[in-house]
């Protein structure tokens, strides 16, 4: 069971040297965690920011998406910076995420001061 609380946070702030993005959010609250869906006005940049009750000092970013027509224009950096600020304002001292094993993506996250703390291997079995 969850209690949905809609909260639209909208503001313009220059997070990127190339462009301004206006972000909105919707917050959903369950018993043991909260999820903030963050998206640009035109829905071409979006992600989820989760907060779990058992690790309140850490926020988790997932499902980062930037439409191909605006990639490499600062949208991903802008929405991540929005998430960093939002999480910090709520008492978090770290933000975590999982990334594909792609050198370019991993290096991009490192430029944003993310540190690799583990690696995973996905296994499959035909049945």
Model regions and ranges:
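Short beta-strand-to-coil "C-cap" segments at the C-terminal boundary of structured domains/repeats
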Residues: 123-127
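Short hydrophobic/aromatic beta-strand or adjacent loop that forms the aromatic wall/cage
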Residues: 33-35, 117-122
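Conserved GNAT acetyl-CoA-binding A-motif
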Residues: 87-100
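A conserved beta-strand-loop-helix scaffold within acyl/acetyltransferase catalytic domains
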Residues: 28-34, 41-42, 46-58, 64-65
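Alpha-helical interaction/dimerization surfaces of two-component signaling modules
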Residues: 11-14, 86, 108, 112
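Short amphipathic alpha-helix that is part of the acyltransferase structural core
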Residues: 1-42
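Conserved acetyl-CoA-binding loop-helix of GNAT-fold acetyltransferases
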Residues: 66, 72-85, 111
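Conserved active-site alpha-helix within GNAT-family acetyltransferase domains
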Residues: 77, 101-119
């Amino acid at each position: 069971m969850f209690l949905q609380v809609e909260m639209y946070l909208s503001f313009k702030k220059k997070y990127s040297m190339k462009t301004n993005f206006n972000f909105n959010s919707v917050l959903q609250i369950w018993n043991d965690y909260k999820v903030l869906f963050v998206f640009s006005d035109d829905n071409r940049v979006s992600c989820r920011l989760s907060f779990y009750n058992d690790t309140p000092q850490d926020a988790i970013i997932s499902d980062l998406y930037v439409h191909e027509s605006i990639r490499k224009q600062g949208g991903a950096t802008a929405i991540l910076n929005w998430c960093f600020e939002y999480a910090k304002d709520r008492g978090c001292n770290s933000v975590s995420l999982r990334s594909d094993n792609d050198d370019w993506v991993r290096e991009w996250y490192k430029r944003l001061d993310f540190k690799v703390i583990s690696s995973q291997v996905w296994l499959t079995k035909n049945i």
